[in-house]
């Protein structure tokens, strides 16, 4: 972990260490959940502790660092996926209405879909068609795809996947049952249909 912290800018390192010091200290910013763990390993974090206590954005950046240090193309591609997850997470944290991005004129993703996501979709019957390319070109849909793929790929506990699948199933049932989609235009409906297909691919409700 010391090598990673040496690799980041002084300001970024100061922010990471300052946040951890505050959460592990005895002041008002003390973290009731992980503060004692931080205090115990302060300055000498094993990677499993570091990953447990840092912000998600730091985890994503550490993933980038490791991919470069060991020349792991797979980790590099996964880093781009996790960057999209981070962006969606930040949007949700700021109460952004994601559905507002479900239009053909909304912001583009600005990058090609990850080869991991593309391969996984194809393996589950969602082939590389003009419609798929158009949907994944949409920024919000691309971020949702990255997040659903990541839950499927990185969350290895069956109980974790089942819990998330159940929650997303409830979201789907609500969206389909409240009548909003029946009153929406065809463009909005097609975006939701594609999201449901991805949900069936990566987080199916048993």
Which role does the model predict for each range below?
Residues 41, 88-89:
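Homeobox/homeodomain signature
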Residues 50, 60-87, 94-206:
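Polyanionic, low-complexity intrinsically disordered segments
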Residues 1-76, 99, 150-163:
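Short, contiguous, well-structured surface segments enriched in hydrophobic/aromatic residues
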